[in-house]
Each structure stands twice: as structure tokens, then as C-alpha cells.
Amino acid sequence: IIAQYLVKPGSTVIMNYHFTTSKAHVTRLGGKVEELVIDEGLKVSSTCPFKGNIDLNKVKACVEKEGAENIAYLRLEAGTNLIGGQPISYANMKEATEYAKSLGIPTILDASLLQDNLYFIKTREESMKDKSIREITRMIADLFDIIYFSARKFGFGRGGGILVRDDSMYTEMEDYITMFEGFLTYGGMS
């Protein structure tokens, strides 16, 4: 639903790392994905505490090459499922989203593995050690235009959700729900 709403043929989605279906939806619509996780993220023996961080220099180079108007959105995954759930730091999320927003690029968080990522932020990021998990969660939520999650992770159950900051985004995305999930009036299940 998110890709259907934001991706246009020839547009680019910037990600720290893809998830299979997220990438498939983008490419199905004629967009392309740029995976810009830090180099340490793909080194098995690395002791980097946040191997899911996005490389901000690569992000800036990508935006410069493609043009901000051709970036459909910045998608960050906390943690990066396909490379072992590697966490992303709060500081990295903040810097990446501030940069994207300064150029009018929508910011999206895949929060399907957020609970583990929150633990790593609290225990590995010095500036977050005295914050509660609730406080960190709120701080992260404030960074993004859209947050979505799959509730299937960690055995929570079937389903998921999309949270949007902007009412007009909600209204426009609502039109796509019947094509993929069924009508809102019966819980979005077809």
C-alpha cells in the first residue's frame, strides 16, 4: 500500500537494507531500490554495535545523482531482518530522516523488529542509556512520516499496521486497501 502510494516508474527508494516484499513492491511499480547499509553491516566478523546503520555519505551521493524529486522515500528497517536483525542507532535514524525531510523526501520506518532494536539502542548508545524504552520509542516515532510493522514477528499474531502522521496520506492510501486487504469496515481482511 505504501509503495503503491509513493513509488512512480523511474523513482528510487533508499533503504538501509531491503526486506524481500518491500523491494518487490517497489520494483513491481517500476521503481528501483538503493541499499545503502554501512560497509560494516555486511562484515560477519565486525564488532560494530550498529551494523544496520545507513551510510549517510552514500545517501547524499544517491540523492545528488538521482535528484531529490526522484526519491520516492527513505525507508529504514529497525533491525535489518535479512542480515541477521542488525540494529540501527537512534542517532543514525535522526540524521538520515532530518536530511531526507530537509529535501521533502518522505521518511518511513519498518518497525517489524523494533523491539530488539530498542534494546540495542538503550544498551549500546550512550546518549540513550538513561531513557526508558517508552521514551526511546516516542523519540523514534517523532522522526518518521510513516511507520509500518508486521505483527507476525516474534509470535505476536497475524496482521500488522500502518501508522501515518498526515491525514491526507491516510485518506489517499485508504483507496489502495481494498485492492490488497479488503474493506476497512471488516478489519482489512479479504
Language model regions located:
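Conserved PLP-enzyme active-site core in the AAT-like
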Residues: 1-190
